[in-house]
């Protein structure tokens, strides 16, 4: 990208900032949304973070999506059929839809997007969601045929993932690799500007295909990293919605009669992976001991202010095909006994890294450090920022990695068991390929996960996914911690704006009232 291009973009952004101050038009029905971090890219195919994909929902849509309860819904698709061999998906498209640049959304546009997403040469971060596609064909303007390399029964759920959006082919041709700065989609709002430290601005798209929507004139997405500042913007009325709300401030905001505090159910699972290829974590008794050593109820009280529930399995309960187990009980005596049996009567020393450095992560690290010390395990803790995580955890394979204990979380935005299990537990998902930071490998789990994708029979899938979860729960490659509740707050004047279980937002029906 040239210096001139960067300067031009920043000049445009500065002009928009000035317009926001000088022009009363922006204040008509502008919802200001304060979020917890900056955005990495406005190309959902090349973004790994949920916030970037949430913002992209302003201007982009996919063929399918999820409602607020993570139930699959049609969006730009009207219907679909699957061939008897599970290889071909024929999708009928909604007629009369236009991109923001005036070009038609049609089967040819779907082909362009899926060809781009499934081509490994493009090196897009979300390639794994589309790598099973063999070819995409435009049958006619409103019919697209997608052929897979092998049966993959979770494919429609993958197409409902927030990465699987439809970008204007004309814009892709015009901007190429710069499309992340020039989004053009079919969504309710049109992109205006991105000031990369201060805001993303979108405005109502007058040609939106759903009558009567959107109701807001514009949305300003503001990254506000500091927890106190984010909450303060809400209290002063400078923002109408804020997420995440720091758990320790929830009770303060709850007392403000102009605000609504909402604790939503989630599929955000928190855990500590243990690198099972390294001593002492190659010993299952050590892994079991560490699960017994952590008081999950106390952790939830201390770190999450009660806004979480103990993990009841490898999957959150609301994920399709999840199996519910009894949480690992707190039993430090049992933990010490298991460590002794494993050959570590005096414990051991190791490291604990975190994928985030915010206040909740810091509390989890400190609490875990104290709990493990009580059974003789001494840990040195490091809270990482996004750059460190990408380099040291996601970017290194089993021979180079320094990962031992790693605190992180996962939200399976397809709503289905495959995306909640395969990236985290399959042998093929060891970093840097995907996110199996435990470097866990169980041939039967691999077989179960592969076979579950070859069948569309729900009973058979349930049996296979249950067997995989049974083995993962018993093998304990993680310290299974908690499933978070998602705490947001909003002005009572803002309606129809909420956090979904996968941590993305729903706001198509959002409105501001006086």
From Swiss-Prot:
GO terms for cellular component: ATP-binding cassette (ABC) transporter complex; outer membrane-bounded periplasmic space. The keyword Transport applies. SUPFAM superfamilies: Periplasmic binding protein-like II. CDD domains: PBP2_Ylib_like. The complex is composed of two ATP-binding proteins (GsiA), two transmembrane proteins (GsiC and GsiD) and a solute-binding protein (GsiB). Residues 1-27 form the signal peptide. It comes from the Bacteria. Belongs to the bacterial solute-binding protein 5 family. Keywords: Periplasm, Signal, Transport. It is found in: Periplasm. It comes from Pectobacterium atrosepticum (strain SCRI 1043 / ATCC BAA-672). Its main location: periplasm. Part of the ABC transporter complex GsiABCD involved in glutathione import. Binds glutathione. One of its GO terms (biological process) is dipeptide transport. InterPro entries: Peptide/Ni-bd (IPR030678), SBP_5 (IPR039424), SBP_5_dom (IPR000914). This is Glutathione-binding protein GsiB. GO terms for molecular function: peptide transmembrane transporter activity.
């Amino acid at each position: 990208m040239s210096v001139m291009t960067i300067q031009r973009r920043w000049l445009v952004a500065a002009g928009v900032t000035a317009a926001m101050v000088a022009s009363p038009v922006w204040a008509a029905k502008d919802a200001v949304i304060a979020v917890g971090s900056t955005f990495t890219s406005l190309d959902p195919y090349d973004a790994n973070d949920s916030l970037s994909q949430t913002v992209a929902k302003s201007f982009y849509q996919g063929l399918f999506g999820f409602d607020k309860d993570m139930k699959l819904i049609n969006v730009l698709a009207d219907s679909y059929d699957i061939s008897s061999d599970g290889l071909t998906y024929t999708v009928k498209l909604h007629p009369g839809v236009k991109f923001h640049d005036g070009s038609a959304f049609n089967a040819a546009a779907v082909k362009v997007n899926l060809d781009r997403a499934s081509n490994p040469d493009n090196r897009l971060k979300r390639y794994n969601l589309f790598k099973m596609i063999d070819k995409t064909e435009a049958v006619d303007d409103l019919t697209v045929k997608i052929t897979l390399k092998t049966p993959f029964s979770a494919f429609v759920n993958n197409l409902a993932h927030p990465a699987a959006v439809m970008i204007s082919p004309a814009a892709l041709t015009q901007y190429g690799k710069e499309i992340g700065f020039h989004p053009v989609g079919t969504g309710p709002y049109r992109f205006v500007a991105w000031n990369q430290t201060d805001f993303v601005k979108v405005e109502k798209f007058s040609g939106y295909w759903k009558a009567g929507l959107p109701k807001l004139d514009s949305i300003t997405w503001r990254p506000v990293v500091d927890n106190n500042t984010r909450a303060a913007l809400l209290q002063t009325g400078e923002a109408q919605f804020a997420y995440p709300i720091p758990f320790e401030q929830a009770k303060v905001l709850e007392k403000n009669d102009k605000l609504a505090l909402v604790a939503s159910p989630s599929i955000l699972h928190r855990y500590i992976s243990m690198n099972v290829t390294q001593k002492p974590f190659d010993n299952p008794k050590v892994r079991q001991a560490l699960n017994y050593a952590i008081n999950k109820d106390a952790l939830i009280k201390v770190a999450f202010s009660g806004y979480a529930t103990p993990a009841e399995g490898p999957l959150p309960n609301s994920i399709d095909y999840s199996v519910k187990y009894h949480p690992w009980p707190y039993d430090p005596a049992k933990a010490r006994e298991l460590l002794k049996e494993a050959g570590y009567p005096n414990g051991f020393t190791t490291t604990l890294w975190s994928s985030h450095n915010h206040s909740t992560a810091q509390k989890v690290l400190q609490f875990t450090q104290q709990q493990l010390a009580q059974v003789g395990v001494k840990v040195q803790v490091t809270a990482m920022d996004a750059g460190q995580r990408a380099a040291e955890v996601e970017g290194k394979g089993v021979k180079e990695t320094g990962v031992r204990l790693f605190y992180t979380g996962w939200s399976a935005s397809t709503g289905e068991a495959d995306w909640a299990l395969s990236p985290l537990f399959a042998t093929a998902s060891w970093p840097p390929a995907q996110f199996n930071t435990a470097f866990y490998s169980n041939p039967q789990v691999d077989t179960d996960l592969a076979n579950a994708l070859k069948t569309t029979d729900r009973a058979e899938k349930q049996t296979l996914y249950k067997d995989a979860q049974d083995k993962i729960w018993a093998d304990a490659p993680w310290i299974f911690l908690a499933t978070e509740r998602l705490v947001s707050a909003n002005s009572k004047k803002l309606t129809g704006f909420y956090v979904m279980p996968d941590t993305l937002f729903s706001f198509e029906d959002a409105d501001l009232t006086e």
